[in-house]
């Protein structure tokens, strides 16, 4: 008795461990076998030299074998005092009993005459068999015998702790016997309709409930034959009774319906696409079974499920087995290639049953997939077991999970272990105790373990989730990021980053087929158009350079502002008030220095942020990058220079035109025949990204004063004579600090606008695409200047210098009135470095890029100040911009530019 009690306790604990995932328990609880409880010198699972890629076998509901004790005790103690606790069922007992008695509660719906008294208990003696044929008598006796066995099982299991499971097993057994009896008469329509009418009229209520349970089970398996059987009774009971009976027989009940409906499988990371390979040619005559539909609905919780059906011409007439197999493999392979073309960065998981598992393995050898799940893998073939030297499956590089039954005829667990040792790919094995080739457990196993087939299927699905979660997490770890949703990630992060990272994942796997993400060309414009991502089956994604219209740009602006909220910034950035406070202090010091300047000083001072020479490491980086003829793919987090540069452009607009015209780079037409006065400082290194922010003064009223960064780097053309610079600078500043003239913008508002734009640039750089240009980048930005202004080219700085434009209040008389005197004043203005120390008080603005996001520090920032005659000048957005034109004669920008969305 003690041995039997210990065996029962062990089975109870094993059953709880086997279904621990139904209670959301730890996975490691299931791995408590004797090896973990043995001595410390027990060999681990990876001690075998050939088992480096084979993970330990997971056992589901496998009862350990224990040898019976040979010694017979004379005195066996019997414990009559200890109360054994009732084992907790693995389902909601109350809900299971409710669905279990559903047919008994609604048995009246099946009777043709509801008002007639129910048949007595001895109904068999009252059955009139006069005129029955031999076939009718034999069929009736077979059905009656099956129903009597079910009735006895119900009475025997009544009141048991796991009565719903035992009832389910008995109903399935009765349904199988009824189906065999009906098949013995070849489902003769007249005979089965006569049988159904006779049983409904003569059976007692308990026996009729058992008969309805059997019909309910068969309706889910063979709905067409059952509908043909119920035609005669539906005409007698009427429309209401027929509808009630149809609803009752709609689906078979399951004790675990509550557990399975409330505990859905969790979604896999990366939003994978799950392809189900068919086990044979599909046919409309044989619809998918209820169990396969349950599997497909459960797998749809993990990701997008795409069944791959194989259709043969002329119903497969004249098609051999080898041709059919080649057709099946070709269908799955073409579907994989189609998905790769439409969704190149989506993980693909192949799942197959039996022969479909073999098809999935063969496709994984030829095409790139993330993982393969083989359910009921057939190891034995016509030519013998698999695993020979010439077996193509030994070349698999894709992680694979094998799920087999303990009692499988086509795959023995020990032979499967030998086969796993020969595979170089990462593989795992799950053995389902008491299951056959289709992973269906026997009735004895269901009774002993208190399980149903749906519970076993759910536990297998949990094992699949554990395996795929680990594979997908490691696959995304190779791409240099934590698990995340690829659907949202394709909007936040440019695909070229994943394209680069997949490149060093593929060589790591040897001969594994390369991911299609590594085959896509780089974007020629340095920024990827999200409109090129197409999910349509008729179009393939491709990178392209387009001229963005105003409506398209507004939609991109909205999406960029929305995505900005989801980007986590790990580095501290300047807030709005901090930037205002720093610029207020900067302005105050600027005013003190401005009062001490001589009257003839120009109204703009170019202040270098750092005047020290660049470090040796930066010079070496610059020399190496300038030697490259094409930009390489930098690793995330690397940077070419520690400090960005600012390019300053002074543009004035007047009514007079002279000199060569600068073609407009904005989408809105500007004044034709303009000539900007532009100065560029520093060099643009090859492969580096250029971050360009433009502060423009456009036509608006004095009440607007909007400040933003232009979405595209462009230089607006302007018609100038050299004398227009004085007009511009006289409008930009006030005559005295205390007075404010109408139409004049003070230095405070200009600096405040600069703070807004720089803060916006700092907060948005983490969401910008970083794609180097495939062509060679210019080593220096070339600028065309008018002849009187050639002296501006004398001012050059290193790559680590930031130059800012600071307006200083002055009068018109201090600038000189003649065009010939202006170059001298500007020369004095640019060569003056008196405010170099003053600008060093702004350390927070030197680093305006979020380096934690993986983007490089911007190398250049362009500040453009444009004045318009007879207009009130304010800081406002430039308007709708277009893609930068590379044939501009006024300013040549590097092609690897980054577009900035405007400030909200």
UniProtKB/Swiss-Prot annotation:
Q: Which InterPro entries match?
A: AB_hydrolase_fold (IPR029058), KANL3/Tex30_Abhydrolase (IPR046879), KANSL3_1st (IPR056519), NSL3/Tex30 (IPR026555)
In this chain, composition skew of type Polar residues spans: 551-562
UniProt-listed Gene3D superfamilies: alpha/beta hydrolase
Say where the protein is mainly found. Answer: nucleus
**SUPFAM superfamilies from the xrefs?**
alpha/beta-Hydrolases (SSF53474)
- Basic and acidic residues: compositionally biased ranges: 476-511
Keywords attached to this Swiss-Prot or TrEMBL record, sorted alphabetically, are: Chromatin regulator, Cytoplasm, Cytoskeleton, Microtubule, Mitochondrion, Nucleus, Phosphoprotein
**Taxonomy, superkingdom:** Eukaryota
Q: Where in the cell is it found?
A: Nucleus; Mitochondrion; Cytoplasm, Cytoskeleton, Spindle pole
Any one GO cellular component localisation term in the record: NSL complex
Span list, region Disordered? 476-563, 608-678, 697-719, 762-782, 869-904
Which regions are flagged for Low complexity bias?
512-550, 700-719, 879-904
Residues with Phosphoserine modification: 523, 536, 540, 773
Which GO biological process annotations does it have? chromatin organization; positive regulation of DNA-templated transcription; positive regulation of transcription by RNA polymerase II; regulation of mitochondrial transcription
Subunit notes for this chain?
A: Component of the NSL complex at least composed of KAT8/MOF, KANSL1, KANSL2, KANSL3, MCRS1, PHF20, OGT1/OGT, WDR5 and HCFC1.
Q: What's this protein's function?
A: Non-catalytic component of the NSL histone acetyltransferase complex, a multiprotein complex that mediates histone H4 acetylation at 'Lys-5'- and 'Lys-8' (H4K5ac and H4K8ac) at transcription start sites and promotes transcription initiation. The NSL complex also acts as a regulator of gene expression in mitochondria. Within the NSL complex, KANSL3 is required to promote KAT8 association with mitochondrial DNA. Required for transcription of intraciliary transport genes in both ciliated and non-ciliated cells.
What protein name is recorded for this chain? Answer: KAT8 regulatory NSL complex subunit 3
């Amino acid at each position: 008795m003690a041995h039997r009690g210990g065996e029962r306790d062990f089975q109870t604990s094993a059953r709880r461990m086997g279904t621990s995932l139904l209670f959301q328990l730890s996975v490691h609880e299931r791995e408590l076998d004797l090896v973990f409880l043995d001595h410390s010198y027990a060999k681990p699972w990876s001690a075998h030299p050939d088992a480096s890629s084979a993970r330990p076998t997971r056992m589901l509901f496998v009862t350990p074998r224990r040898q019976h004790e040979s010694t017979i005790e004379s005195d066996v103690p019997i414990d009559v005092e200890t109360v054994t606790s009732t084992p907790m069922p693995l389902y909601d007992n109350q809900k299971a009993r409710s669905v279990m008695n559903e047919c008994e509660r609604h048995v009246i719906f099946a009777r043709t005459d509801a008002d007639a008294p129910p048949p007595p208990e001895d109904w068999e003696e009252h059955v009139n068999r006069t005129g029955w044929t031999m076939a009718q008598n034999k069929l009736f006796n077979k059905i009656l015998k099956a129903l009597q066995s079910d009735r006895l099982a119900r009475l025997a299991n009544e009141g048991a702790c796991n009565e719903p499971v035992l009832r389910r097993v008995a109903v399935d057994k009765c349904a199988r016997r009824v189906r065999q009896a009906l098949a013995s008469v070849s489902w003769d329509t007249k005979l089965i309709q006569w049988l159904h009418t006779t049983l409904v009229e003569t059976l007692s209520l308990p026996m009729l409930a058992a008969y309805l349970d059997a019909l309910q089970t068969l309706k889910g398996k063979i709905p067409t034959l059952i509908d043909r059987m119920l035609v005669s009774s539906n005409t007698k009971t009427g429309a209401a009774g027929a509808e009630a009976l149809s609803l009752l027989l709609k689906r078979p009940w399951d004790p675990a319906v509550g557990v399975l409906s409330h505990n859905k499988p969790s979604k896999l990371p990366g939003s994978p696409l799950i392809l189900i390979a068919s086990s044979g040619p599909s046919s409309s005559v044989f619809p998918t079974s209820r169990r396969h539909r349950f599997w497909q609905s459960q797998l749809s919780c993990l990701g997008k499920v795409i069944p791959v059906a194989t259709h043969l011409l002329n119903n497969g007439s004249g098609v051999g087995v080898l041709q059919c197999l080649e057709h099946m493999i070709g269908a799955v392979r073409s579907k994989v290639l189609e998905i790769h073309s439409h969704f190149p960065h989506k993980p693909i998981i192949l799942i197959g049953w039996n022969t479909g598992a073999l098809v999935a393995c063969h496709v994984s050898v030829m095409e790139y997939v993330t993982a393969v799940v083989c359910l009921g893998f057939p190891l034995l073939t016509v030519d013998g077991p698999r695993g020979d030297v010439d077996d193509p499956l030994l070349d698999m590089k894709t992680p694979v999970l094998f799920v087999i039954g303990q009692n499988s005829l086509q795959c023995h667990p020990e032979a499967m272990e030998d086969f796993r040792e020969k595979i170089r790919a990462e593989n795992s094995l799950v053995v389902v105790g008491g299951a056959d080739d289709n992973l269906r457990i026997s009735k004895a196993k269901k009774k002993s373990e208190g399980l149903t087939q749906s519970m076993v299927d759910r536990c297998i699905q949990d094992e699949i989730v554990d395996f795929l979660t680990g594979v997908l997490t490691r696959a995304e770890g190779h791409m240099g990021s934590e698990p995340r949703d690829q659907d949202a990630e394709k909007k936040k992060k440019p695909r070229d980053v994943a394209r680069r990272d997949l490149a060093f994942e593929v060589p790591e796997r040897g001969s594994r087929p390369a991911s299609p993400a590594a085959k896509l060309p780089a974007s020629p414009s340095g920024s990827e158009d999200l409109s090129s991502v197409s999910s349509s089956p008729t179009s393939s994604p491709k990178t392209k350079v387009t001229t963005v219209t105003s409506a398209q740009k507004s939609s991109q602006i909205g999406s960029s502002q929305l995505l900005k909220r989801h980007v986590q910034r790990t580095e501290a950035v300047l807030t709005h008030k901090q930037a205002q406070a720093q610029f207020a202090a900067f302005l105050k010091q600027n005013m003190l220095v401005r009062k001490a300047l001589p009257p003839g000083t120009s109204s703009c001072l170019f202040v270098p942020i750092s005047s020290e020479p660049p470090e040796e490491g930066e010079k070496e980086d610059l020399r190496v990058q300038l030697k490259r003829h094409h930009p390489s793919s930098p690793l995330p987090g690397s940077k070419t220079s520690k400090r960005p540069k600012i390019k300053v452009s002074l543009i004035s607009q007047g009514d007079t035109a002279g000199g060569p015209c600068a073609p407009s780079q904005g989408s809105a037409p500007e004044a034709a025949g303009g000539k900007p006065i532009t100065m560029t400082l520093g060099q643009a290194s090859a492969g580096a990204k250029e971050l360009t922010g433009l502060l423009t003064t456009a036509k608006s009223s004095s009440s607007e004063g909007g400040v933003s960064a232009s979405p595209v780097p462009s230089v607006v053309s302007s018609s100038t004579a050299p004398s227009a610079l004085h007009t511009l600078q006289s409008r930009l500043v006030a005559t005295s600090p205390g007075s404010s003239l109408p139409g004049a913008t003070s230095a405070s508002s200009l600096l405040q606008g600069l703070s807004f734009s720089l803060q916006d640039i700092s907060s948005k750089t983490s969401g910008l695409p970083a794609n180097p240009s495939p062509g060679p980048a210019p080593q220096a930005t070339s600028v065309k200047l008018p002849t009187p202004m050639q002296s501006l080219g004398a001012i050059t700085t290193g790559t680590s210098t930031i130059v800012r434009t600071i307006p200083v209040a002055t009068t018109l008389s201090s600038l000189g009135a003649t065009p010939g005197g202006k170059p001298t004043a500007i020369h004095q203005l640019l060569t003056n470095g008196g405010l170099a120390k003053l600008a060093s008080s702004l350390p927070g603005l030197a680093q305006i890029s979020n380096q934690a996001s993986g983007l490089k520090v911007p190398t250049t920032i362009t500040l453009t100040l444009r004045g318009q005659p007879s207009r009130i000048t304010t800081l406002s957005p430039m308007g709708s911009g277009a893609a930068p034109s590379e044939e501009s004669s006024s300013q040549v920008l590097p092609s690897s530019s980054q577009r900035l969305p405007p400030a909200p």
